[in-house]
């Protein structure tokens, strides 16, 4: 599978990801600095969507997994084994320099029941009582669950996310023996603390100028998580480490599809 996408038209229209033909797309980098005249730098980049390549992608996937989980959590699991599982599962990577180059982004749907004895599945089951209960329910039913793993370099544009998900979901259905999708999805992601200064409260406002104190709020590393969280059946956060907060969400199929649709609409509204 190869889907060639040029970043420029992702900003101009929604992409029908089920088209087999290449799509020519160009966009303005949303994070590029404007010069004194207000002009924006235009960056044209070709993004190619490939299936996971075991002969090329292994080490890059391990690095992206380490970025996703953070070093401390990554040390609690066998990343090499997890990378192998990802490369055996429906996985889409995004590259800019051909199939033999390192991926800048990946999305994988790992079948929980197929890999329930894996180190990663056991890690998730033991992570929180809510997940333990959820997986026990899946184990004792005919329902299916995919463990979603998705990470990208920080400068990857969010516009690639809807086609990335739609392509991979289509691959899952196409490669399934019954042509069906998964019933549930567990998404592991993260947020980060945004620090800011604020005025401290004082009972006597006339006594002294109010002090500036540090506050913080949370924002998303992955913009799609903002929309997924709205539809999550289970959603909770892990302990904060160095300003990074793990995020865990369980969605049903309808919720996942709707969240990606909402992201597409949000992206279209930015233009």
From Swiss-Prot:
Name of the protein in its database record: Protein BCP1
Record region (Disordered): 1-37
Keyword Cytoplasm on entry: yes
Keyword Protein transport found: yes
Family per similarity comment: Belongs to the BCP1 family.
Lineage of the species this protein comes from: Eukaryota, Fungi, Dikarya, Ascomycota, Saccharomycotina
Chief location of this protein within or outside the cell: cytoplasm
Function: Involved in nuclear export, actin cytoskeleton organization and vesicular transport.
Transmembrane annotation, as ranges: none
Any one GO molecular function term: protein folding chaperone
Any GO BP: ribosomal large subunit export from nucleus
Keyword field: Cytoplasm, Nucleus, Protein transport, Transport
Species annotation: Eremothecium gossypii (strain ATCC 10895 / CBS 109.51 / FGSC 9923 / NRRL Y-1056)
Record Pfam families: BCCIP
Subcellular location as annotated: Cytoplasm; Nucleus
Xref: InterPro entries: BCP1_family
């Amino acid at each position: 599978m190869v889907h060639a996408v040029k970043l420029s038209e992702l900003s101009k229209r929604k992409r029908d990801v089920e088209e087999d033909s290449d799509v020519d797309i160009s966009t303005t980098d949303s994070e590029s600095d404007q010069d004194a005249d207000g002009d924006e730098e235009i960056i044209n980049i070709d993004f190619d969507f490939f299936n996971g390549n075991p002969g090329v992608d292994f080490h890059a996937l391990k690095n992206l997994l380490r970025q996703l989980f953070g070093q401390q959590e990554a040390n609690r699991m066998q990343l090499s084994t997890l990378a192998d599982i990802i490369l055996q599962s429906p996985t889409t990577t995004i590259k800019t320099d051909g199939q033999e180059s390192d991926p800048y982004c990946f999305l994988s749907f790992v079948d929980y029941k197929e890999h329930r004895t894996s180190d990663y599945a056991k890690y998730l089951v033991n992570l929180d009582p809510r997940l333990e209960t959820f997986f026990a329910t899946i184990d004792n039913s005919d329902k299916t669950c995919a463990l979603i793993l998705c990470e990208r370099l920080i400068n990857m544009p969010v516009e690639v996310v809807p086609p990335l998900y739609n392509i991979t979901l289509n691959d899952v259905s196409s490669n399934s023996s019954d042509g069906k999708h998964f019933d549930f999805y567990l998404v592991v992601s993260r947020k980060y603390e945004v620090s800011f200064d604020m005025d401290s409260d004082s009972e006597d406002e006339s006594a002294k100028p109010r002090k500036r104190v540090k506050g913080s709020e949370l924002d998303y590393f992955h913009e799609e998580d903002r929309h997924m969280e709205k539809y999550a059946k289970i959603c909770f956060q892990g302990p904060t480490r160095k300003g990074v907060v793990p995020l865990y969400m369980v969605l049903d199929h309808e919720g996942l599809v709707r969240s990606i649709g909402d992201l597409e609409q949000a992206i279209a509204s930015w233009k």
